[in-house]
From Swiss-Prot:
Expression sites by tissue: Expressed by the skin glands.
Source organism per UniProt: Bombina variegata (Yellow-bellied toad)
This protein's name: Bombinin-H4
Main function: Has antimicrobial and hemolytic activities.
Residue positions, PTM D-allo-isoleucine: 2
Residue list for modification Isoleucine amide: 20
Entry keyword set: Amidation, Amphibian defense peptide, Antibiotic, Antimicrobial, Cytolysis, D-amino acid, Hemolysis, Secreted
Family affiliation: Belongs to the bombinin family.
Keyword RNA-binding: no
Localization per Swiss-Prot or TrEMBL: Secreted
Record's keyword annotation contains Secreted: yes
Top-level taxon of the source organism: Eukaryota
């Protein structure tokens, strides 16, 4: 259960960083 959640969080975080950067 934690694996998929971490994947979603990582994907969202990556998108945010790309937006800010």
């Amino acid at each position: 259960l934690i694996g998929p959640v971490l994947g979603l969080v990582g994907s969202a975080l990556g998108g945010l960083l790309k937006k800010i950067g």
